[in-house]
Every structure is written in structure tokens, then in C-alpha cells.
């Protein structure tokens, strides 16, 4: 509560005390109420001559205190980021009725030469803005070159600016360094970055501001060194600014690479503690121009808006002759299929728990009613505007002829009727019966503890005949719906056994949300007689024998196969002087297409994307990717973990090679082993046997050819049928041919963590690189006494490893998090083969290093296959799910900006104090001289036509008393089903996301979650036609920003029912998650007149 009050106080300061020297005018507000599910909005309007006057203050009667921004015709910017105070908002009735403009022309329109508003816009009288003393305020400097401006005396603030810009902020680079090859620069860069001092203490309220440019499609950013920001030119480019290390990168969405600002020449302006930066980015004549300057900031940098603008103006008009003071890069863009439509600027302030997104609309290229839909989606914090846009059109029952459909993929319009029927159809009766049974059990297993004021689990004393009957019915339904037959031939428990098993699982996951508990109660292990033996049959790793010196000599004397393409690339040899000359023309303009081409050479297969990059990787979050179609496997009651880990690894390699996803047959590999059925199912093995079987048989059929059921493991290898597909084909096993001393392993490479004990960062970087290149890595871990049927999986576990691993899994991704102690750390995302309902949707997370006192790392060994794969006979037909990772132009069809689920978490993490984390954008390391083979230790209002405004979970920001926060955040009459460990009081008052931190547990211990719970307020600003509208979304946990969905964004037409809508979302998400539009599905199930789930 203290932190919540702190957030409110700071926001009040931000909105009430941020003085801006521009005009202030009065304009009607729009939006829902602030009591929950609505939006406070702030409308910013420009006058004909860019001047206006202040009229009144924000108050509870509904009047809004608004601040107009300078008219871009008179100044360099059409908007500033100064915040204004807010009162409670009015209704939408005050807004003019939406009109349907003509269809936008395909070409990029130029900015209007006059700032006079159109007839449909409110026009305010032309008045000269005056200061408190009555003096006129001179217009801000023009964006045009100085020669076109009327000379005027230099003011004192201008003198400060000129003085700040005149002195270079960092030592100049010598001519010798300027002429040095890129290879040399790349070698020097890491060491320079590593020696940097901690960044300066940034301003508690403001550490960065952004402004829209007048004459070009672009923005200006000014801030203190140490901030991490991003600028997105939708729908084509994303720019990264990691100012701590003076790193700027460009990521074209039409290609999966990142281009470094220092690609051609070293950056001269280096950020340092106590310094500030100015960054200009805009597009002119199909040329992307970036300008970067570091300077000593004046004391009134953010207190006086004029100072910031003058500094930015001075940087923006830098000529080529002055490039020695300002770093300038120009990139010729390839031919794009549509113009730039908007620019987003993203920043974070971890000290205040704030995220801010500004959305600048560049041109009116979309009809007004369509624009309102996208604006509402944005103001509710959606990371995928397109999905929200689809949902809104479906809820509005829009006809296929509706003009808004032209901004969505054609598949939705073509399949509109089918989509609607799917949402209206009934679920399978047995499936519904199981969901109902689980709901009854969850309600039965918790009782209100009046003394502790919370819900607590029942005990055996509360066991009765009603519960006994429901437990029997529950397991009966589970067995009938168990397509993997894991309960077949198994000894089922009686009602007492089931009660104890379920009670243990609920204790271990005591703080899990109800939605996740629904999934966990689908785990068939709960119905077993002896649940402790459940995991024993699922382990099955036997380490291969150590390679002897004789075997090493034999391997080195054999004729080697071709090397893996990943090993052929020496990163430092990719860029020589001749190649660089071809990239830059005589005018110093870099050809982006050629720069992209060379950047791709860093890996033949890896494409950097918002779903997998150097900081974060989870390709399963990208629902259009090939890899996301690889399902979680259930190995059943056989010790075949080694087989399923190898199978998944092979399938991700196929996706990364562009051959598409065809599910391979695990049963074929199991039955073609030269062992008996009992030995195969009970004794276990390792990935080397997987490769030996395939290399010998030269065949691997589809799962549909020879489907897997654990009870069908027989030890009898089938004869391939004529209609079977061979996924193995002419695949070759390659030698590991890394540089330096090594043991040659044929078909695989082994990384043992014990040999990296003195340099675990190298081990971690190697595994991350392999995941980026091959989609996954096979890993050996210890599960006995640590991981069992009740393991949580959603929360990051901090566990040690063991010298004798017993299980094989796949590392499929990684990411960063902030620990309870405030330390920046990283985790592995691991996939198991124990079914979708184990862990968290079949996966779990572990800290990459584990506790400080660990003798062994949690990852005992990592293995990757080294194979030269050829496409199978069916890889070019419609049966194979193509690799959308390598068909990025298909994703570019989206009109709206799309972000990954990790986008805001990454933004916050990189701004989090400490800054000690490794840069997420730096290039791969050169591991050529490392021994990696294991022999050395040196190594979101109208029910009929809903157009609600942004979700509001904060107080009226024009009035700042603390009690208003309680009014805005709570509804005393609202009812909610609390999570198991939530107090009754907290549940009643909660109107935000319950992203509870749960226990990272084991079968024998119930350790607390190691991840810090951080409350976040997301401020969203939509700027269009010189008007600004604000939205607010509050998250109880930073991790909520990482989810594909969050029920906190559920919208209620009656604010009193917000908690009810949120609860409905949590309880029914599992039914709708696979629908074309889950939000539409939920809205249809709930009834369209009550809740709206398009923003979820």
C-alpha cells in the first residue's frame, strides 16, 4: 500500500507540477469514468496560429485541465511530453459524430503546409500566448535551416545551449582509430563497455522527453545518459537506444537482423555519468537519418521546455560539415509496401514504477471510426493492436463490407461466418463436465479463515461424502478424456489417495491463479495410488561413456564430413574494407539492403526478432512461427525422456533450416532400438542412441504414419510403408569442428558445465547462441527429490544441479528477471515431456546460475546436434507447416504496430538501476578458441456498439489526495474469487491484476519464489491531429506485462462489475484461448451487454 501511495504521489507531481511554456486551451474531454474500466483522457488541441490561453482547472465536476502543444507551423515540434492535470471525464456524447473519410491514397502524404484545423475540428480563437508577466512568448526555433529564419538576438538559454554543444562531451577519436577496420573496432568495443562507470542518478520525475518533428516523419528525443529507450517507425522499423553504452541499433521488421549504428565508423559522442544526449531520427526522401549528440546538461534541462527544444533544434540542423560534433548516419531504405503511419516512443522509470508509451499518428491514413478502435486498443495497453481490432469488429457484428476490414489480413474477412459460428458453438459435453467438476473441487478445497481473514485449505476433518463422490467423478472424467492413456494399466487411488494428492498439489501451488489451477488439475497423476512413483517411470537418462584418448585419436584420423554452417563463420572476417566500400555511396548514405545482407552472415539461420534476440527468446510466443506448432509431448510411463528431448531438438532444427514442421514418430525410434520392450521402457538411454538409430536406418516417418502410445513400445522395428514420409532422408552427421583443441564428436557437440565452473558466463552465452541458431538445446538435469508432478513451473526456481543427472529435457528459451533482493538475473525456459498439464503448460523456468552455494549447475550438460539436413519429400507441400520465422514479409502485412509479450518487461529491466546486466544487443562472442568438448577446465460504452475508452485503474490525476486512490482502485461491493493465499480484505479492494508470486517448489520443499513483485503503472499517450488522449493501466506485477493476455484489462460497462468480468475471464480463458479471437469468444460467452474482453 505504501508503494501504491508513492506511485500516486509521483504521478500527481508529474501531472500537476510539470510547467510548460506553451499555450493552454479548453476542450471537451472524452472517455469513461475513472472508477474502474473507464479512462481519464487529456485532449490536447492546437490553434490556428499555435497560440491559446488558459481557461480553468481540472475538477471533480468533469472539466479537464488541458495543455495544448505548440503549433508545428511556428515551432519545431507538434507535441511535447509535458503532462497536464486531469479531472473526471465526461461522456462520449460531447464528441462530434464520426465521419467516414475517403479511402487513403497509397502514397505518403506530405505534412499540411498550414496548421489550420479542418472544418470538422474545433477551432479556437487566435490569441497570442502570454506569460504571467504579460509578455509574448517568442516562437520556438524553426525546423528549417537557419538561413531561412529571421535572425534574432541570442537569449541566455540559447547561450547555455550553444555553450553545451560547443564542447565535445567525450574524447575525440583519432584519425588512426577512424580509419581502423571494423574487425579492430569490434574487438575494442567489449572491453570499453566493460570498463564504463555506473550511469548517473537520473531525475526522479523526468529523465527523458520526446517531441514530434514538424517537417519530417520523425521524432526528437532528449534525456540523461543511462536511460534505455525505443523508437518504432510503424510498421517497418524499431530503433534501440542503450545510452549507457552509447549503443544505437536499427531493426527492420521486414528482415530479421539488427544494424549497428557503429557498423561503419566508431561513435564519437560517448555517454558518461553526468552527461545528457540528444537523438534525432526521421525519414526524408526514403532516407532514414539518425543524429546523436552527447553534451553537458544545463541545470534546467527538463524544468524549462525551451532549453530542451533549442538543444534539439541545434542538433537537427547539423550539416555534414559539422559531423565532427554530431554523429550522423544515413540509410537508404528499400522499397516499402506502405508509408510510415505512426511513431511510438517507449521509455521506463523504474524508480517510480512507470512505463510510458507515446503514439504519434503521422497522417490520417485510416477512417475515423477505424482510428477510434485502434486508439482504444492502444490506450488499454494492448501489445497486439491487430488482435484487439479484430475482436472489436466481431463484437460490433461488422459486415464484411465494412471499410475497417481492409486494415486486417484477408483471412478474417473471408472466414468471418465460420469464426462467429465457432465462438457460438457448444463445448464437448464431457469437457464441460470436467471443467465443472474442477470448479466444484476448487471451491470445496478452500474455506474462509475468519481469524486470519483469508482462504485456507481444508483438512481431512473436512472430508465428507459429497467431496468423496466428486473426487470419484473427477478421476473418472480425467481417464475418459486422457488421449495419451497414461492411466491405462496404472493402479488408481481411492478417494483418500486422490484427496491427498490434490491437497499436496494445491499446497505447493498455494498462490497460483484460479485459471492456472484449472490446468494443473488436468494432470492425471493426481488420480494415482502411489503418486511418488509417477516421476520414476518418466526419468531415463543414462550418461554415455567418457571418450578415451584412443577414440579421440581415431576420430581425428577419420575423413571428416562437411562442417556445420554455424561453424564456418568467423564473425570478425565478415566485414572487410572492400565490403564496407560497397555499402556506402559517395554521399555517405548506407544502403540498408546491403547492410542487412552482411548482418545476416553472422548466422546462416538465426533471424533476430521481437520473439528471439540476444536478451530474450521464446519462439512459442510467436503464434505464426514454425516452432510454435511443436506441441508438448507426453512420454507416458516409459523412460524415454532422451528420445523426446532429441525429437524436439531435431524438429526445431528443421524449422530453423526453413523445412517446416512435420511431427516425427517417436515410436519408430523406440521400436528400432536393438533392445527388448522392457529394456527400452525401463532402462533409459541418451541422445547418442537416437542419432545411431536414425543413421543406421536412414529413415524417420511422420507421427501420423506411426503414432506414439507408450503401451505400444514393443521393440519391433516396423518396415516403412510406401505411403510413409521419410523425414531423415540424406541427412549427414557432421563433425564438431570448432577452432582450437577439441575432440571430434560425430553428429553432436557436448558442453559440460563443470568445465566452465570458473567462467559460467561463457557457458551461458554458448547455450543462448545455440538456442538462437537451432531453436533448442538438449540438457541433462537432476529431477529426483527436486521436480515432481506438483512442480509449479510458472515461477522461476532457484535450484542446484547434481553430478549424476537422471533426466533429459530441452532448453527452448531464456530471459531476464529481477530477484527479490533486487538483483538483475537470467533464467532458462525449459520444456519437459511430461504432458501439457504438468508444470506451466509443459514448461518450467530455472535461474541460470542457481544459489551461490551450489557445487553443480542445474544444467549438468548441454548437447546440440551437428547435422547437414536435406528437405524431405513432403517439405514443399501443404502438409508441412512452413517456417514463418524466415518469411518475415508475411508478418509485415499488419497495419498496426505489434510488440512481443516481453517488450515492456525488457524495457523496464534495461532501465532498472544497477545497469550491470550484459547488453542484449551486442553481437555473438567468438568462441573459436574455447574447448567445448568437455576435456578441459579452462573453459482492453455502448452495449450495442461498444466504444469504451482506456482502462482506468488509477485516481483522478487532477486531484491528488491519497483517499482518491482507494476510491479508484476498489469497489467495496464487488465480489471476486480470491486466489488461495489472498486475504479477504485484499480481494475486496483489488481492482487490478492479481499476478501472484507463487512458490517455486519441489516434492520435498516449498521454497518461496525468487522473483521480485513489482507494481507498474503504464501511462499511454495517443497524439493525433495535435490532440493528446491519455490512458492508464495498472499492473500488480511487472510479469503481467509479459503474458499474452491479462484479465486485468477486462472491461465492464458498469464499473461496479469490473471484478466480476475479470473473474469470468480467468475462469473461461482455457475455453477460448485457441479461438481465432479469444476476446470475442469470452465476450460472446459472457453476454455482450456486460463485459468486453477485446483488450485482454
Curated annotation (Swiss-Prot):
Bias (Polar residues): 123-147, 925-952, 964-975
Entry keyword set: Cell membrane, Glycoprotein, Host cytoplasm, Membrane, Secreted, Signal, Zymogen
GO molecular function, a single term: cysteine-type peptidase activity
Ranges annotated as biased composition (Basic and acidic residues): 102-113, 149-161
InterPro entries: Papain-like_cys_pep_sf, Peptidase_C1A, Peptidase_C1A_C
Glycan attachment positions: 92, 204, 607, 637, 662, 671, 712, 892, 951, 981, 1039
Keyword Magnesium: no
Membrane topology: Peripheral membrane protein
Modification after translation: Proteolytically cleaved in both blood and liver stage parasites. Precursor of 130 kDa is processed into 72 kDa and 55 kDa forms. Proteolytically cleaved by SUB1.
Species assigned in the record: Plasmodium berghei (strain Anka)
Family per similarity comment: Belongs to the peptidase C1 family.
Protein name per Swiss-Prot or TrEMBL: Serine-repeat antigen protein 3
Stored SMART domains: Pept_C1
Residues making up the signal peptide according to the UniProt record: 1-21
Protein localization: Cell membrane; Parasitophorous vacuole; Secreted; Host cytoplasm
Role summary: Putative cysteine protease. Probably involved in merozoite release from the parasitophorous vacuole during liver stages.
Main localization of the protein described in the UniProt heading: membrane
Bilayer-crossing regions: none
Record Gene3D superfamilies: Cysteine proteinases (3.90.70.10)
Single biological process term from Gene Ontology: proteolysis
Keyword Secreted listed: yes
Compositional bias annotation for Low complexity: 77-97, 976-1006
Annotated Gene Ontology cellular component terms: plasma membrane; symbiont-containing vacuole
